[in-house]
């Protein structure tokens, strides 16, 4: 299978790399393409964008880097479309990843799996509607999620 993964920060890179390792054991023909980091790259596949080039937290940093943020969104969408994976796997990072879920589901009809669900219990409860609409399978790492 062809897997496209998106992890936008260091902990996502760690969890996604472990997931990739497990997927390779179950699917020796696995092909990976991803936005991620060094740990994911060590598992193999094609690193499209390193998370260090896209991790902006808070309103002001996002605003100051809006051109880069929008470029990364466009790059990710076009790369997903070109690679056309069998599944899109999103790892946490909801501000970016929920946009990709909507795009993959509505424009490309690609199954969307979310590994490490967004913390809707902590903030932005409204995201639950988008998750229900655009995510096919959700995998939580905490028992109360």
Predicted regions and their residues:
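Active-site and donor-binding regions of nucleotide-sugar-utilizing enzymes
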Residues: 3-145
């Amino acid at each position: 299978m062809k897997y496209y993964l998106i992890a936008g920060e260091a902990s996502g890179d760690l969890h996604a790399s472990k997931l990739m390792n497990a997927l390779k054991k179950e699917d020796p023909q696995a092909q990976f393409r991803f936005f991620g980091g060094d740990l994911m790259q060590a598992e193999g596949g094609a690193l499209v964008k390193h998370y260090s080039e896209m991790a902006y937290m808070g309103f002001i940093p996002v605003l100051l880097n809006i051109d880069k943020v929008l470029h990364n969104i466009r790059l990710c969408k076009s790369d997903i479309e070109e690679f056309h994976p069998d599944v899109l796997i999103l790892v946490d990072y909801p501000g970016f990843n929920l946009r990709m879920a909507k795009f993959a589901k509505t424009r490309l009809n690609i199954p969307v799996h979310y590994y490490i669900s967004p913390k809707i219990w902590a903030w932005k409860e409204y995201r639950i509607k988008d998750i229900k609409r655009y995510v096919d399978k959700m995998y939580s790492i905490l028992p109360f999620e």
